[in-house]
């Protein structure tokens, strides 16, 4: 294995970390309705916990309203309860076989909590990136010990790993900044 292969293999993992972070912050509430808001909601259905999106369609009715069209009429009650109990500050209302979820405006205090949560997710993601960088450097040093590569190539590989880390940390910082603006927007 070469340094380039080590870097490429781990760059794919770094990209996955960024994608996971994007998915994580997409579920954080802003003032607008988004289907990602209900991604983590689990419904007690057919004897097991299932994601809400597996028991019905979730759509955006308008800027402040989500609509959940439940496929099985018997699941309306449990789905409504799951949304209410998800600690998202939402109050769902059942209307026949669908559930209307109004997104109330965020209070200043709640906005600050969501900003803190966004930053926490960002820090967790950065730790994950740093761990991947550490793994890359260990693999590169192992290659040098096995005499597969020379010291110059090892140093170049470490430099590439650092540059890659900084590139992805910068992306996370930009995503955090963008999400904070979105949350604080009234």
From Swiss-Prot:
Record keyword Cytoplasm present: yes
GO molecular function (one): ribosomal large subunit binding
Keywords annotated in UniProt: Cytoplasm, Protein biosynthesis
Domain of life where this protein originates: Bacteria
Matches recorded under NCBIfam families: frr
Job description of the protein: Responsible for the release of ribosomes from messenger RNA at the termination of protein biosynthesis. May increase the efficiency of translation by recycling ribosomes from one round of translation to another.
HAMAP family hit by this protein: RRF
Designated name of the protein: Ribosome-recycling factor
């Amino acid at each position: 294995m070469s340094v380039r292969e080590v870097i490429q293999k781990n760059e794919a993992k770094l990209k996955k970390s960024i994608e996971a972070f994007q998915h994580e912050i997409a579920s954080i509430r802003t003032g607008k309705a988004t289907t990602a808001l209900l991604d983590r909601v689990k419904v007690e259905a057919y004897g097991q916990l299932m994601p809400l999106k597996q028991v019905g369609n979730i759509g955006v009715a308008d800027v402040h309203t989500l609509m959940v069209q439940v496929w099985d009429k018997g699941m309306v009650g449990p789905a409504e309860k799951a949304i209410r109990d998800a600690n998202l500050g939402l109050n769902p209302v059942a209307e026949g076989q669908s559930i209307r979820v109004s997104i109330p405006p965020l209070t200043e205090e709640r906005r600050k909590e969501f900003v803190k949560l966004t930053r926490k997710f960002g820090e967790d993601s950065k730790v994950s990136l740093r761990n991947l960088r550490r793994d890359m450097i260990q693999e590169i040093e192992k290659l040098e010990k096995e005499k597969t590569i020379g010291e110059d190539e090892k140093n170049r590989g470490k430099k590439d790993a650092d540059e890659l880390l900084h590139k992805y940390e910068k992306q996370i910082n930009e995503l955090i900044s963008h999400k904070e603006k979105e949350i604080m927007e009234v």
